[in-house]
UniProtKB/Swiss-Prot annotation:
It comes from Talaromyces marneffei (strain ATCC 18224 / CBS 334.59 / QM 7333). GO terms for molecular function: metal ion binding; peptidase activity. This is Probable carboxypeptidase PMAA_093910. Residues 1-19 form the signal peptide. Pfam families: M20_dimer (PF07687), Peptidase_M20 (PF01546). Binds 2 Zn(2+) ions per subunit.
Amino acid sequence: MKVSSLLPSVLLLVGATRASPHPAQPPQQQPLNNIIEESNTQTNPPNKHDLEHVIDTSPLLSLHRDLVKFESISGNEADVGDFLIQYLQARDFKVEKQIVVPKGPKGQGERFNIYAYPNSTPEPRVLLSSHMDTVPPYIPYSLDLPSSNGSTTDSLNWRDNILIAGRGSVDAKASVASQILAVLEYLQLHPEAPLGLLFVVGEEVDGIGMQYFSQSELNTSPPTVHTVIFGEPTELALVSGHKGSLFFKISAKGKAAHSGYPWLGQSAVSALLPALVKLDTLADIPVEDGGIPGSEKLGKSTINIGRIDAGIASNVVPASAEASVNIRLAYHDVEKVKEIVTKAVDEATNGDENVTIEWGNKGKGHAPIDFDTDVDGFKVMTVNYATDAWYLKFHEGSGGSPEGRVHTYLYGPGSIFVAHGADEAITVRDLEDAVSGYKKLIEAAFERNKV
């Protein structure tokens, strides 16, 4: 590729992006198309500079890069949040910084949501939302190209297959970046479109950001929005529903003693083990035998004993033991599942009062949640993971929708199978296809709610 032949177009693209804060100039994206076409026709093997050039010359890919380079593990979202505020304000957005956790005495620890909309349209009707936080550990941003099998197709389409890795590259900074670009590009053609963006903290832990937003004045009563599009890794499919979630801790108390004389003590581990063995089977045994129900739509409920802590040393009879358990619920009745768990533990331990259950999330748990899938042209699937969409509780009212309810969608680039893993990564094509997908959902929402 001849860089010199691209330089005027690149300078035009960069200049247009920086010089005008409002994205009202449709021509500014045209040079990017030329760059894409020329990049995809290069026959020489691309080098590191070629990969970086693709990122640098794309508003979408460079924004995604900038986001992933921030370490924003849950609780540490402030830096990436400040960056997003500046980015959106420079593009003529009104940004409301919603403080969720205030700064500490030394100015540390501030956590905030970002609620943004064009200055020209202060009441969004369509809201796109995702989260700024990631799971640990931080993995630096990097670029790579999957090995080619030597085919002509591979050599021509190398740009689409560039692999962008790093923590959050999929979950969920891919959604954040593609949602922003979708909104900017839609506004270029429809400058008065009432669109909004909501980026929250804490989705990966406790949903604190969405809970705070849901209880705030920004979640208006009655709703002003008629559509909310949540961004998570769905492999560019519309999700018709995801499982609920129930966390709990099961603990046992014992009495410490020398391991050479275990009869002088009481092992908390021995008390806990029968309960864990029973719990481990609850999603696999028939309901009539005390198992946890599933559903036709979401399949089986699943149970995971994710952490066990006990004792202080191998030569001491353990005086305490506990396990953390998570059930992914395909069944709608959370209270019924809690009854099933309680009964199973009681039967397995013969009613041992030293074994107790502590329900997480203030004992509430989350039932499965459904989403809309009424837009043509998308694959439709269900997922086993949960999102913070459960926490967004709409007030009574139609949100301007003739159907009398707020429509919700779950969609985004990347695969959940690599999210949270050491190999978290996404391709250029997935990111760019997501922008088109989000714009299609936006357009369908406005078409559906035409008066």
